[in-house]
């Protein structure tokens, strides 16, 4: 299931997604209420640090979240089981049902990693290897979904 808004960037992405029976493309086609229901039906959330990630976390979904220079102490997803979020910036970390992937490229304005873009600029680069995300998702899926009776 792929979701997104109806802005130009998401609309362009929607055009690039192949038509396949196992891909449900809801980009630009869901209200917030509909997204809550779709998220509740999902097995996991894989995506950026967004409201959707926090919705999935509130529903105790397995989270694979991609962060840029965000201050994870403030914005990482809450683990209901642990009753906490993360407190450290690290390239890859897992706490209970949450795995975070964070870019380790320093902020061009202040040189910090995880400054949270406090300079009102959006000029950050990401150096997260997509393979590391795929590997973590595959490992979880094979251990928890495929092997379940």
What are the functions of these language-model segments?
Residues 25-26, 57-147:
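Nucleotide-sugar donor-binding patch of glycosyltransferase catalytic domains
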Residues 1-73, 79:
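Donor-binding and catalytic core of enzymes assembling or modifying cell-surface/extracellular glycoconjugates
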Residues 20, 148-149:
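Compositionally biased, intrinsically disordered low-complexity segments
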């Amino acid at each position: 299931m792929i979701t997104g808004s109806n802005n130009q960037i998401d609309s362009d992405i929607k055009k690039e997604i192949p038509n396949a029976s196992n891909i449900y493309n809801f980009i630009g086609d869901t209200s917030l209420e509909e997204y809550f229901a779709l998220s509740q039906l999902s097995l996991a959330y894989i995506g950026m640090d967004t409201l959707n990630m926090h919705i999935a976390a509130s529903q105790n979904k397995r989270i694979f979240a991609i962060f840029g220079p965000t201050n994870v102490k403030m914005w990482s997803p809450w683990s209901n089981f642990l009753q906490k979020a993360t407190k450290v910036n690290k390239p890859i970390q897992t706490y209970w049902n949450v795995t975070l992937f964070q870019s380790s490229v320093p902020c061009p304005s202040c040189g910090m990693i995880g400054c949270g873009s406090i300079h009102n600029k959006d000029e950050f680069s990401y150096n997260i290897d997509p393979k590391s995300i795929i590997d973590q998702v595959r490992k979880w899926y094979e251990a928890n979904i495929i092997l379940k009776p």
